[in-house]
């Protein structure tokens, strides 16, 4: 099943794309698997392609393969901050955000794989990995991040008592994942520096049937990142832009 997509936003102007998805059952498995593809191009020369899926394998011992991979190329404008020393000779000692933006190019590819194994009917535990390869071409700046390679390893725990994965009418879904990531040596004015990241994500949903055709649903979702490197006053992670202005601050 596929549909065309047309959208408009002030950040990306007109966007044109397509979304495809397929549902199927793998051998010896009652749960339904899904594979999705989507891609978009904007009139500001921003574009991305993305593929993701949730596959169920095994008979009585069910395990999942959840994956997400893609590539994006998003020219954008980065509004950095200035420091005291930048304008010390001019007598301006304030700290704040620069009024004039800096054009830059953000190109990144990513791969996320999770493989939870069901230890009983509702609980699954398994490993996960997250890989990010990014290239930031920032004009008129002393910071070079070219390329940035980050590899993260961790684990995921999930609980799923929903009566239907795609159109649930009752049940609870809870998922917690934690990863630790390492980057390659990043070139900065003071030398080379590696970055260590910790990421904690949680997703909690509940579906409560109120009547025959009315369902109350709520969701809590959060993602926390910790980053450690010695030179703290240099922003090694600028905004990673997405179409429509939904930026991700790394």
Per-region residue spans from a language model:
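Gram-negative/organellar outer-membrane beta-barrel architecture
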Residues: 1-2, 7-149
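Short, well-ordered amphipathic alpha-helices
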Residues: 18-24, 51-54, 155-161, 202-206
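C-terminal outer-membrane beta-barrel translocator/porin domains of Gram-negative envelope proteins
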Residues: 153-158, 164-250
